[in-house]
Amino acid sequence: MKQLQFLIKPAAGHCNMRCHYCFYRDEQQNRTDAEDCMMSLATAETLIRRCFAELDKGGFVSFAFQGGEPTLAGLDFFHFFTQTVRKYNQKRVTVQYAIQTNGLAITEEWAEFFSKEHFLVGISLDG
């Protein structure tokens, strides 16, 4: 049974903190538009479609999100992502989600989403 693992940076190095030691800090100074670093829904769907084309029943896929700060891609992005996974997961492979976040953007709505979709949530304490 095939297993796939993806590390996804939906907001690239974009972050809502400015930690002096972060290597993404220098990168962000070169960006003029935060939207330039966000993963498009079309790219997300292509990744998901290709992923499930490779897997058979009994397979496993892990989608781990990190950044920068992945929550800056927005809750709508994550809703789209999980809905698209359900759309393409016709063979009913096991899906696991994880996210590494600084937690600053997490609201009750985010927490409910993470719970509903069974995300493993890691909080980084930086700053």
Indicate where each model-derived feature is located.
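Radical SAM/AdoMet-radical enzyme domain recognition
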Residues: 48-64, 73-127
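Alpha-helix capping and helix-loop boundary segments enriched in small/acidic/polar residues
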Residues: 34-38, 69, 98
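Canonical Radical SAM [4Fe-4S] cluster-binding loop centered on the CxxxCxxC motif
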Residues: 2-42
